[in-house]
Amino acid sequence: MAKTSTSVIVAKTLVHAAALAPIALLGWQFWQVWQSGSDALGADPVAEIEHRTGLWALRFLLITLAITPLRQLTGQAVLIRFRRMLGLYAFFYATVHLAAYLTLDLRGFWTQIFEEILKRPYITVGFAAWLLLMPLAITSTQGWMRRLKRNWGRVHMLIYPIGLLAVLHFWWLVKSDIREPALYAGILAVLLGWRAWKKLSARRTKARRSAPPQATPR
C-alpha cells in the first residue's frame, strides 16, 4: 500500500476544514437565531438554511465532477485522492438539505413528503438526485470497489444524471431570477461536454490505430 505524503495529508486537512466551514457558520447562526431571535439568517431562516445547504451540495457535486478534467489538464494524478472526499461532502450537504426540509419546513410531518414529491416537480427531481447519491456514498470505499469490480465504475456513472437533476431542481425552485442556476448549468455543461469530447477523441484515435494500412499506389 502506497504511503500518503505529508503534503497530501495537509492538503486533505485543509479541504476538510474548508468543506466544514459553511455548515459550522450555518450552525452558529442558527444557534444565534434560536437563542436570541437575531436576524443572522435573514427574514426567513428556514429558507436560508435550505438554500445554503442545497447550494453547497450542488457546489461540491460540481467540484467532484471537475476533478477528472483538472487531472487530465494538469497531469496531477494526486487530485484523484480528493474526489471521494468531495463526493461524500456533496452527499453530506444534500442530506442536511433534505433533513432541514423535513424537520424545519414540514415540521416533522414527514408523511407529507410523498404528497410534495408528487405535487412539486422541483422536489421530485431533488429527491431523485438524493436517492441516486446514496448508493454512490455507500459504495465509495475500497472494499466496495473490490466487491463490485467493473460494476463499480458503472454505478458511479450515476453522478452524471445526478448533476443534471440537481441543476434542474435548483432551476425549477427559482421563480424569477435564473442567473445563478444558469451559471451552475453552464458549469455542468462544460464538465460533461469535456468528458464527451475526450471519449469521442479516444474512440477516433482507437479507430485510426486499428484501421488497416492503405496500399501505396504504384
Swiss-Prot record:
Topological relation to the membrane, as annotated: Multi-pass membrane protein
Pfam families the UniProt entry points to: Ferric_reduct (PF01794)
One Gene Ontology CC term in the entry: plasma membrane
Principal location class: membrane
Subcellular location: Cell inner membrane
Obligatory cofactor(s): FMN; heme b
Co-factor binding details: Binds 1 FMN per subunit. Binds 1 heme b (iron(II)-protoporphyrin IX) group per subunit.
GO biological process, one term: protein repair
Transmembrane segment boundaries: 8-28, 60-80, 86-106, 121-141, 155-175
GO molecular function: electron transfer activity; FMN binding; heme binding; metal ion binding; oxidoreductase activity, acting on diphenols and related substances as donors
Family affiliation: Belongs to the MsrQ family.
NCBIfam families for the chain: PRK05419.2-2 (NF003835)
Subunit structure: Heterodimer of a catalytic subunit (MsrP) and a heme-binding subunit (MsrQ).
Protein's name in the database: Protein-methionine-sulfoxide reductase heme-binding subunit MsrQ
Gene name of this polypeptide: msrQ
